[in-house]
Amino acid sequence: LQLYFPDISRFKDPDASQPEIMLYVAGKTFQWGVLIFSSVTVLASGTAAHAGVSRLMYVMGRDGVFPTRFFGYVHPKRRTPAWNVLLVXAIALLAIKLDLVTATAPINLGALVAFTFVNLSVISQFWIREKRNKTLKDHFNYLILPVCGALTVGALWINLEESSMVLGLIWGGIGLVYXACVTKSFRNPVPQYEDVA
């Protein structure tokens, strides 16, 4: 590839260079085949994510975490969370105009938050609560490895795009205000949603 493209000046669009690379390296037929396959997999992935988010919002609405009237609604004929499906689609349509960095900002932030708390929860649950801190193996599995994981994720936090941090703080602030309203200034317990097998 370095022989074909010694630097990015040869690309018409450096942010979307894959189709150009495939055209020059393998020809138009290969380029079309990969682009069609990529389109199908993106649509399948998007449909699965759309359905998953809609159903999660339904469960949260059903259990009172979100307003039940809207989020807990199920279409009587199709048995789908229709309002949630439409809401997710409307938000997805708003994202069409976003550039790649802005569109991936909340995903990057969400992943880093999740991975950080997964590591911290291992320490909290096993090393502190269950007191699995007697042997060297316990210290290694339930303290050292999760701390290493949290530090590794911490290195990624340092390199996070500024737009991700700003969007994350805004999103977190909205969530905090919503939780304060739902719990009447944190005097009532936070609503929990229940898994139904």
UniProtKB/Swiss-Prot annotation:
Location of the protein in the cell: Cell inner membrane
Domain of life: Bacteria
Regions crossing the membrane: 33-53, 85-105, 107-127, 140-160, 163-183
GO aspect biological process, one term: amino acid transport
GO cellular component term, pick one: plasma membrane
Mode of membrane association: Multi-pass membrane protein
Reaction catalysis annotation: putrescine(in) + H(+)(in) = putrescine(out) + H(+)(out)
GO MF term (any one): symporter activity
UniProtKB keywords: Amino-acid transport, Cell inner membrane, Cell membrane, Membrane, Symport, Transmembrane, Transmembrane helix, Transport
PANTHER family for this protein: AMINO ACID TRANSPORTER-RELATED, LOW-AFFINITY PUTRESCINE IMPORTER PLAP
Protein family (similarity comment): Belongs to the amino acid-polyamine-organocation (APC) superfamily.
Described function: Putrescine importer.
Name assigned to this protein: Probable low-affinity putrescine importer PlaP
UniProt lineage: Bacteria, Pseudomonadati, Pseudomonadota, Gammaproteobacteria, Enterobacterales
